[in-house]
């Protein structure tokens, strides 16, 4: 079982790619999307014996002026990803390009597959990292909602004003009862309305955009519990082919997580921006700034040797000896994809003896306590760093004593480490 999300994207991609050509009518492209549950299609344009790849989205097709229009007027040049690109890098490339899908190409630029946000959800659902990540960590907490009796027009305005593609629909008690998306409005309201010569459907006294949103919302509402993992949320979105899922506790709405949230989180893992550091125990305010700087410095050193760190937990115990003089015991836990490292820091000498020998006053006690804490903290962190360096040299004999910045060399085999299933 791979833990590092570093397999080549060709192992994740969908190999059987459905494509269209630039002269395909919008109506036919929409039919292909609805039949297969696609949100995007690749357009293959052959020029001078070579293929160029473009993308079209369902949203763009639904906004077309005519269903007889050719897709060439709506397609855009696709950013392609090489088949040997590591999965994490491929996710970053997709995110940077603004695409939710990307053609996968070989060494000669020939398309061999496609990766979509659906494929990313499938991989995330199996990821040990994502299983260890609470959905509450990546969800949006301040959810924009709409009452089930509010108009469809209001729902559209809320989406436009907040630059979002979906709204959770709530009842009068504020409990979530459904979901409405921009595509729902386009498919169920906008497109049918465009076919009419008047602004209302025959026999209706209220225009469609003025009707209650409950008429077009998706129900029953699919949710995940507040205790679920990010992997659980990814699995639900993949299984039900939805792009966002509310997070609930009982009947209470606590947040919402989308495919984009998970994609961004995965990209942040690659960029090293998601190392969670937890401090347990009493950290005196006068130590805080210096302690944080020391932790940040040592963590950077750890990342160079570990490649990836899931989380760091530091426990601080402040105790007193028989003479009432405070001292610290600090333990640092560092979780990598393959191992849990533990480092301990303890006072190196008896503080009372030092004070008695020096004969200093209480101000000295306070200052000495500060540096005693810092010394113990550094010893705890450096203990873990020494273990990481030892493992790095053990599995990188060619690079003993050196650091390869960014990631492990190719000869590193994560299977040699003890796995934590």
From Swiss-Prot:
PROSITE patterns: CBS (PS51371). The keyword Repeat applies. It comes from the Archaea. Residues 13-74, 74-133, 139-195, 217-274 form the CBS domain. Disulfide bonds: none annotated. This is Uncharacterized protein MJ1404. It holds the Pfam family CBS. It comes from Methanocaldococcus jannaschii (strain ATCC 43067 / DSM 2661 / JAL-1 / JCM 10045 / NBRC 100440). Keywords: CBS domain, Repeat. InterPro entries: CBS_dom (IPR000644), CBS_dom_sf (IPR046342), Diverse_CBS-Domain (IPR051257), UCP036983_2CBS_MJ1404 (IPR014651). Gene3D superfamilies: CBS-domain. Signal peptide: none annotated.
């Amino acid at each position: 079982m791979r833990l590092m999300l570093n397999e080549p994207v060709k192992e994740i991609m969908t190999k059987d790619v459905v494509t269209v050509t630039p002269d395909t009518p919008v109506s036919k492209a929409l039919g292909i999307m609805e039949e297969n549950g696609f949100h995007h299609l690749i357009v293959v344009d052959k020029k001078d014996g070579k293929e160029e790849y473009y993308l079209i989205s369902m949203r763009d097709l639904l906004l077309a002026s005519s269903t007889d229009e050719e897709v060439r007027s709506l397609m855009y040049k696709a950013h392609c990803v090489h088949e040997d690109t590591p999965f994490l890098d491929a996710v970053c490339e997709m995110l940077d390009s603004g695409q939710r899908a990307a053609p996968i190409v070989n060494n000669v630029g020939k398309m061999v597959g496609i990766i979509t946000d659906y494929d990313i959800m499938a991989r995330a659902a199996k990821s040990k990292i994502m299983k260890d990540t609470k959905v509450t960590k990546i969800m949006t907490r301040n959810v924009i909602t709409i009452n089930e009796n509010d108009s469809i027009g209001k729902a559209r305005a809320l989406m436009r004003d907040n630059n979002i593609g979906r709204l959770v629909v709530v009842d009068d008690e504020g409990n979530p009862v459904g979901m409405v998306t921009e595509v729902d409005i386009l498919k169920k309201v906008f497109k049918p309305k465009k076919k009419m010569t008047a602004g209302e459907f025959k026999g209706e006294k209220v225009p469609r955009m003025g009707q209650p949103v409950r008429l077009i919302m998706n129900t029953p509402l699919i949710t995940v519990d507040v205790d679920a993992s990010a992997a659980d949320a990814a699995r639900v979105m993949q299984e039900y082919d939805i792009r966002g899922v509310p997070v609930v506790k009982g009947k209470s709405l606590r947040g919402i997580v989308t495919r984009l949230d998970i994609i961004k989180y995965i990209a942040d893992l690659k960029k090293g921006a998601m190392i969670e550091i937890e401090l347990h125990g009493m950290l005196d305010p006068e130590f805080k700034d210096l302690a944080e700087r020391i932790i940040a410095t040592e963590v950077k050193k750890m990342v160079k040797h570990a490649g990836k760190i899931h989380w760091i937990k530091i426990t601080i115990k402040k105790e007193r000896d028989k003479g009432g003089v405070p001292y610290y015991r600090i333990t640092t836990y560092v979780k990598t994809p393959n191992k849990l490292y533990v480092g301990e820091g303890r006072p190196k000498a008896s503080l009372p003896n030092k004070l008695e020998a020096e004969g200093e006053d209480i101000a000295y006690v306070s200052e000495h306590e500060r540096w005693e804490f810092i010394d113990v903290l550094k010893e705890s962190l450096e203990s873990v760093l020494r273990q990481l360096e030892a493992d790095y040299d053990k599995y990188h004999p060619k690079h003993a004593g050196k650091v390869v910045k960014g990631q492990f060399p190719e000869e590193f085999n994560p299977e040699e480490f003890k796995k934590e299933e």
